[in-house]
Amino acid sequence: MRVLVLCAAVLTCFVTVSAQEVAYDRIEPFEEVKPDCPLNELALMFKPQLYISNGCHPYPAIDSEGHFSNGLSAFRIGTSCDGSSKGSQVYGRAFYNSDRNIMEIMYAWYFPRDRMITPVYIGHRNAWEHAIVYVDVAKDDPQLLAVAARGMWSYRTYNPPRSDYLDDEKSFKLQYKWIGISHHYLKGTKNPGEFQDLIMWDNMTVKARHNIQEKTWFGSKAPIADDKFFKYLEKARPF
């Protein structure tokens, strides 16, 4: 049976939330979670870093009122997406695999566009990328067992993670890149990257969780939404 480990009880209720699109660089990020419970402490400890070799930097996707980013057109030449002045965000959601005593933590990043510069501009508005880390929580000292990064067509699995892709045996280094006319994707790298403020699913407001469940981003839901989260966990699991 699936057991989702929560820091605190999450309110479940029927809500009606009006969703408003906001300019991609005007979304206020959530404050980073505090290490005030075992799950948040674990998620902060194993938070990956992101090295941007090309393309947009990650931006906040949704604010506390449930307003979401309207993205950025792939054809707006000269428009910067090097990071929001309001701060950036990485979204986390966790699942406890009781059969193996492993915490599976998904980290997801939102990008206002996914554009590749070839002889012509190709791409689209709004994009998500994600990676899943697998942490052995059977002992007092949690250990990173594996990482699954969403690649070009499927998951790239690092089981066990390479030591030169890690900082302090905990923070996995990911590269955001593209090849040829492919879309952007994630892979392990030796290059140090940047950290974004982490907001966990259970710490988001009801409005934000509701609207991120309902919102379709370039034909798909956010990877932390119910429609995708459990499917991706099943597909990526390396054990």
UniProtKB/Swiss-Prot annotation:
Glycosylated position list: 203
Pfam families referenced in this protein's UniProt entry, alphabetically: NPP1 (PF05630)
Keyword terms, alphabetized: Glycoprotein, Secreted, Signal, Virulence
Motif window: Conserved heptapeptide motif: 123-129
Superkingdom: Eukaryota
Keyword Glycoprotein: yes
Coiled coil: none
Stated role: Secreted effector that acts as a pathogen-associated molecular pattern (PAMP) recognized by the plant immune system. Seems not to induce necrosis in Nicotiana benthamiana leaves but significantly improves disease resistance of Arabidopsis thaliana to Hyaloperonospora arabidopsidis and causes an inhibition of plant growth which is typically associated with enhanced immunity when over-expressed in Arabidopsis.
Protein name, as recorded: NLP effector protein 5
Record organism: Plasmopara viticola (Downy mildew of grapevine)
Name of the gene encoding the protein in the UniProt record: NLP5
